[in-house]
Amino acid sequence: LEALIAHEVTKRYSHHLALDRVSLAIPAQTIFGLLGPNGAGKTTLIRIINQIIQADEGTITLFGERLQEKHIGTIGYLPEERGLYKKMRVGDQLIYFAQLKGLSRQEAVARSKAWVTKFEIKDWWNKKVEDLSKGMAQKVQFISTVMHEPRLIILDEPFSGFDPINAQLITKEILELKEKGCTIIFSTHRMETVEDLCDHIALIDKSKKILEGSKRQVKETYRTHTYTVEHRGAFDLDAAKYRLIQQRVVEDDFYKSVIAVNDNSGPNQLLRDLIPVTEVHSFIEKIPTMSEIFITLVKGGHHE
């Protein structure tokens, strides 16, 4: 089941095509990475989903229904440009945002108190937002995004301003929300976060979607069939089958080699060919990182 389907969504501004027939299918209860360089169109798509702006063409379906005003309460949105009221106290702010999303005052107070206890920030309840550090304000904004228990959560660069400890806390919360049944759209340039958290990804570049799929499928598509081998003793391999990209001495007679497979031999055949000629200590496929795939596609200008 898809939580959200975007079909040929297009958005034009006077001198700029911000989205060019972008289609996406976001599976329910997954963490979906919406990736792309600055200015690619990610934020435009997020604003359309949040009904802040409207698409010129195309449709968006949310949990099986065409997107409409009533869905605002089922979405939690953490924008990249954070929007807390500087003069307002933390507790009042959380209660206010929760009520905006349809909670009763009593429920808003109860949930706000539960969340500040969970995040160990009860001492901040009566502090004004302007007195908080950037990281503290981030926590408050995150709570206000998820407190009304939305089915779809959209996080735009959620880790900017967080130190590693708080980033870990937010990561844990995101994974818990997914376990509880939430679908999370994660817009970021931080590829290491994508590597750790996302199940599915889409890459938008120059207003078009250029890649979409599960993380495993994407990595499978961009496999380089290259292997790193640590071994004792130098060797030569059949040049028709293998290309020795690198072989360096680590110490004494101990080497680290990088080998590309030229034909369809695969890892088992490579290992069989290595065993008679060297003493293999470790053997691992070099799987491209999401960062490497991102750079290859964006710099290479590859489009579907």
Residue ranges of predicted features:
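Alpha-helix N-cap/helix-start and coil->helix boundary motif
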Residues: 10, 68, 91, 191, ...
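ABC transporter nucleotide-binding domains
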Residues: 4, 11-205, 211
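Generic structural marker for isolated residues within well-ordered, non-membrane alpha-helices
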Residues: 94, 112, 215, 271, ...
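ABC-family P-loop ATPase nucleotide-binding domain
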Residues: 1-10, 300-304
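ABC transporter nucleotide-binding domain
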Residues: 171-260
